[in-house]
Amino acid sequence: MSSNNDNSTNNKNNVNINTDNRLYQLDELISDIYKAVYIKDNDYTIKFIDVKDINLPRFKLSDYDLDIIFDKIKYAGSFPTGIVIDGTSTNEIWFKRRGETEMSTIRIVPYQNKEAVDDITDPINVNQIMKTLLSELVVSEKTNNILLPVINVDVLGSDLTTYGKISPYINSSDDTYYSVQVTEKYYSLKTLDQFFKDYVIEARTIKSIIYQAIDVLYQISVQYPKFKYNQLFPETIDCYLKQDNNLIIPEIKLSNFYLSSIDDLVKNSYLDSNDFTVEQIADQYGDLYQLVNYMWNNLQSSIQNFPDVIKIFDIVLPKKIRSKELYLTSELWNLLSEDEKFELKIKNLRNNHIFTSKDSLSNTTFVKSKDQPIDFSGGSEDNELSVEDFEASEDLNDIDESIPVVKNSSKIKYPHKDIGIMANNKTISDRKLTDNLSNKSSNDNTSETTSDKSYRSSNSRNSDNSKSKTTRSKTQSSDSSKSSRIPRSSESKRSTNSVVSVGSTGSDVYSDMERTEYPSRSTYKSRTINRSDSESSPVSSRTSSPVDDSRLKQSRISEDKPRKNKAYRGRRVIGQNNTASLLAALNDDNYNQGQNNVTDINSIGSMLGVSVNELASKNSNPNYSQIMQQIASQMNGQQASPNSLFGQAGNINQQLNPQQLSALLGQSYNPNTQFNQLNQLGQLGQLNSMNSINQMAQLGQMGQLGQTGQVNPMSQMSQMNTMNPMGQPNQSYNSQNDTDLLYRYMATLNQGQSGQQMDPNAIATLMQQNSTGFPSYAQLGGNVNNNNNMNRNPFFFQ
């Protein structure tokens, strides 16, 4: 997911990895991620990682300006990684970092030894790889429940000791290496364990947490079916705080992947060690069990108040497998039947009717961070307070001075520390994004949420306003000196009592109430996401006018709908001519050619096997003229002209009435009787009499006579009863007229001769060849009940 411009080389593996100078602009990286993921800025494109080519230089750096990372930081606590070696727990040290526009979290964790730095299976490296791989699910909008990484840097402990805020918590030995991991913190962030301690747990809260856990495990399993988290406990799960009226709901964020693995893709050596004894069973449900079983054992006082929540636990945590164990064991799992195990598959749980959808958080807004600029100072001793003065200035409820230094000799396991909102600061601002938000006064009402105590701080909030204004003015003056900063419009300004904060995920982006500035259109590329090539030039994008507030909200509301490109409304010109006139002239020419030379090319008739010419007057039987000559020669050599043979063609109805036909044919004028006799003589083959007549008449199979000058009355009638372009007969065509015409034609041919004087074989051959020389009548939209059509497959219209 990183962009590629400049090259850096890993000497150990001799692998060339392309990196981007943008990686060294930390604040720009953090801003890019926010705009791409939370604002849904379409100026970025995703560049996915090739999982077949996983190597460490793709996931971390070994050379970085630490002054940029530790510019303005604040100690946040020590948190477990889950790694325990010889009884010693390895913890992360957290610092909250205030950037130019957004917040972030710095996590510092020691490697076990120097060799582990380049070991791709080491759990610390596995954590960095996992966060980067799974972040693709977030940027591709599969899930919001994974905390996004920004950069990972390996540093020596001796380099970290030069920063006064950091040195008390690390080992200064030159042979101790640390992983410095910068992750997102756009809103108020804390562990799920701390959330349970600080807030009242409602039914909707419990249901939402369980659903989010199921959904994120499902989304990961779709991409990586062999994924295992192995420690889905509240103290290893981060969460953003979201608010719906007075209810605070956590949006869980998986970020602790030290014990994770993906079989055959990301191997974790720690899982094969003697220090890890967890059974790998039940696929993703084994991870879910850790969370729901913990909640059942530790939130009983809240769960028992809600019967509907108890029903949810009966489904996701059957009574047979409830226990005081942290992990699901094979003994517990085997207590279930195969049907019960099937119902506990992550996919089946996710689709269960007990959950509505992930949209349970759709009407909530993010809670902004309560950290104030005065709480942050540079990490180096030259421009910061002393460690003692800094700790004295911290809120006593926010920092536990008994937290041990995170060293390899530490024996502390799974401490619980708050890294988000300070314990005595529970006030949550309930601001709404409106067009006149900038006109609101600084004394807006706020809704209070408490777990065991309430807090009012109107005076301190007013004092924070002046701090916020001062900080914002400094930020704006700094932004004006850099081309990548954002020009602010009057619509984009927010109330003066809000601190610089950051965006949201999913539908919560619509509110975006914490943003004080809209994002700039950066012309650089991000490590995680790249700019689209379709963007306008860098100069115009940098100097573009400020983003209009209403337009931005409009785009956010319709973000789930694909954008429609503007239609081209001009006239296309070829040379000096308008394209429309050229096409019109070309079409006229084609039409005239088609009138003079009818063709079946590119026509429906050609697809059906019948051309317009064949349907009108021509016959496709190559032996047709020879057969007709043979029939004509049997008429005592009589080769009369059209008038002598047929009389006046226009008066044929007056010359041949039914009585005359009966006299000529020697029997009463009965079509069925006549054709039964002909059929007995073998003159009509196997054709049905009535349908054969209709086919011959409509398809024009009685072509011209042997000589050129002879007129074909059937051809004339076929021109009178034309076929439509789809090959279907005219609806006004009368089958009785077909019968009359054929009898008149046969009578005229005989001119009083008996039928026995004609060669029956010639007529039978003519009728049989013509019946097979044309496609089925059903294909032309006719009746499929014809006996000859019963064995044919009807075409697309019948």
UniProtKB/Swiss-Prot annotation:
| GO-annotated cellular components | virion component
Renumbered to this chain, the Basic residues biased-composition regions fall at: 563-572
Cell compartments where the protein resides: Virion
- Keywords of this entry: Virion
Q: What is this protein called?
A: Uncharacterized protein R402
Composition bias type Polar residues, residue spans: 519-529
Chain intervals for the UniProt region annotation (Disordered): 432-573
Its source organism is: Acanthamoeba polyphaga mimivirus
Give the compositionally biased regions (Basic and acidic residues). 548-562
Bias (Low complexity) occurs at 438-449, 456-465, 473-487, 495-510, 535-547
